[in-house]
Design a protein with these regions (language model features):
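A mobile, often basic/glycine-rich helix-loop segment
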Residues: 138-173
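Rossmann-like AdoMet
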Residues: 1-42, 48-133, 145, 150, ...
Length: 173
């Protein structure tokens, strides 16, 4: 049908849960004295951007309540659809986050791109350049890229395919 059940993974409660986990990481890094370098939170296939917005909102609330200095962070909304990225860049609710450097966008084709080029800041995130951990959020991402399945039989690797329907009754599978 082409429909993605977005409410299940892009609601305020899910955003708050992710924000809480991210805050835990930021707190741990701060307690280790690692609060100089920016932490990147990369959402692969951000779609409509709602989850990212909820996470940013909650992080701001939690950051204000934190008793310690946290490392700076930048949430990166990525997508393979340029129209979505343009929407994020123009959306009024995102402007404050862009201005603070807490939000950026990037076109990412997971089958081709090795680097993530941030559109607003011009920063290129590439392998080995960051010293802080990168948080990656991938709701409804891996189901939209080609997958390969292999198994091991008597010391030989073989590929296989998954079928949603069987030629035999379910009881015999």
């Amino acid at each position: 049908s082409g429909l993605v059940p977005h409410h299940l993974t892009s609601n305020a409660m899910v955003g708050k849960t992710y924000a809480s986990l991210i805050l835990g990481l930021l707190t741990d890094l701060s307690l280790q004295g690692k609060f100089e370098e920016r932490v990147y939170i990369v959402e692969l296939g951000a779609g409509h951007g709602r989850l990212g917005f909820y996470i940013l909102q909650e992080l701001e609330i939690m950051k204000a309540q934190s008793a310690i200095e946290l490392p700076p962070y930048c949430y990166v909304l990525t997508d393979i659809v340029q129209k979505n990225l343009d929407f994020f860049i123009e959306h009024e609710n995102f402007q404050t986050y862009f201005e603070r450097g807490q939000l950026d966008v990037a076109y990412v084709d997971a089958m081709v791109d090795e680097d993530i080029v941030l559109k607003k800041s011009g920063i290129v995130l590439s392998k080995g350049m960051l010293h802080q951990p990168v948080v990656v959020i991938a709701n409804y991402f891996f189901d939209s890229i080609p997958q390969h399945l292999f198994y091991l039989r008597q010391g030989t690797v073989a590929s296989c395919q998954v079928a949603l329907e069987a030629d035999v009754p379910v009881e015999e599978v």
